[in-house]
A protein has these predicted regions:
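Short coil-to-beta-strand transition motifs
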Residues: 37, 74-77, 200-208, 268-269, ...
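Beta-strand-rich ligand-recognition modules
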Residues: 207, 215-218, 225, 299
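Short coil/loop residues immediately preceding or within conserved phosphate-binding loops
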Residues: 2, 77, 127, 205-207, ...
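Short beta-strand segments
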Residues: 3, 182, 186, 206-208, ...
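Pseudouridine synthase
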Residues: 100, 106-118, 149-152, 161-164, ...
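RNA pseudouridine synthases
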Residues: 1-194, 214-215, 287, 295-326
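Short Gly/Pro-enriched turn/cap motifs at secondary-structure boundaries
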Residues: 134-135, 199-202, 263-266
């Protein structure tokens, strides 16, 4: 079983692994990487063994899989709330318990819902499926940006890599941070087999700025600015400084999670805001100087109200249910 296609200009300049992931989002990343390592992926009849190799529009691509699947005709579980839509990208409010990319063929995810919402005739140039630019964990809620064109995807990936995109999060944590404002600078090492991340001097540089907004000693509401973008960064960094996220069953506090299990059924982490500076590339001119905020979800808002904490007006949205929160 194999398939070939001529790459369009939407793919020009993209990393091989990311291009394959966007065309075949239903394939596990491990399967894509294994095929590359084994030399089963070819570009113009040459084995492509480097995941980071840049592809060019017009190249002939050969892969050991079937043709990309058709986008589902209707949403499986409803639409994803849209915060903003332009010609280059779509900004959505990701609900909890939803993957960004499908983990199985035809699986439910943000991108498959976006495909269904836009329809097969929309969302960019022919042959390009709208693609998520960054990742949020399954149970993390909030702002997520989806590229609608290949040139926008490349430009956004560059902006994230160059740390031009500002990312602010809210979290409810166990305990109280030692300082009202602190920067956590602790390198992170990922164990892919165990799917865990830990602080290690052998890891990649990771920095998180943490500000305590409210606390009663037992729980605290914190705002986070991710200065880097590592896997599980916010969760591991907060656990590292003794303030694990409430509801986090991987890195959290077992006893606190047990006591709050009815109110915190997931790690209470929310991608609050995504912002872009002026001076972006012309492809992203619609995004220059813009900030996008997602309303605080019901589970986090309920705990804040119960503790008497005041949420700033610009991050609370009583009409959230009307926008499709699940």
């Amino acid at each position: 079983m194999s398939f070939s296609l001529r790459l369009s200009q939407d793919h020009d300049g993209r990393r091989l692994d990311r291009m394959l992931r966007s065309v075949w989002p239903e394939l596990p990343l491990s399967a894509i990487m294994r095929a590359i390592r084994k030399g089963e992926v070819r570009l113009d009849s040459t084995r492509a063994r480097e995941p980071g190799a840049r592809v060019r529009g017009g190249q002939e691509l050969w892969v050991p899989w079937e043709a990309p699947g058709e986008r589902p005709a209707v949403p499986r579980r409803g639409a994803v709330p849209i915060l903003w839509r332009g010609g280059c990208a779509l900004v959505v409010n990701k609900p909890a318990d939803l993957l960004v990319q499908p983990d199985v063929k035809d699986g439910d995810s943000v991108v498959t819902r976006v495909w269904s919402m836009l329809g097969t005739a929309e969302g960019g140039s022919p042959g390009f499926a709208p693609a998520a630019v960054h990742r949020l964990d399954r149970n993390t809620t909030g702002v997520l940006i989806v590229a609608l064109r290949g040139d926008a995807l490349r430009a956004l990936e560059d902006a994230f890599r160059e740390r031009l995109a500002g990312k602010r999060y809210l979290a409810i944590v166990v305990g109280r941070p030692s300082r009202e404002l602190e920067e956590i600078d602790a390198p992170l090492l990922k164990d892919s087999e165990a799917n865990v991340v830990r602080v290690s001097p052998e890891g990649k540089s990771a920095r998180t700025r943490c500000r305590c907004l409210a606390s009663d000693g037992g729980l605290s509401l914190v705002e986070l600015e991710l200065l880097t973008g590592r896997t599980h960064q916010a969760r591991v960094h907060l656990a590292h400084v003794g303030c694990p996220i409430l509801g986090d069953r991987k890195y959290g506090d077992f006893e606190a999670n047990r006591l709050w299990r009815a109110a915190a059924r997931r790690p209470l982490l929310h991608a609050l805001e995504l912002s872009f500076p002026d001076g972006l590339s012309p492809v992203l001119r619609e995004l220059a100087g813009r900030s996008f905020r997602a309303p605080v979800p019901k589970d986090m808002r309920a705990i804040a109200v119960d503790r008497g904490w005041t949420l700033p007006a610009d991050i609370s949205c009583p009409g959230e249910d009307e926008d499709g929160d699940e």
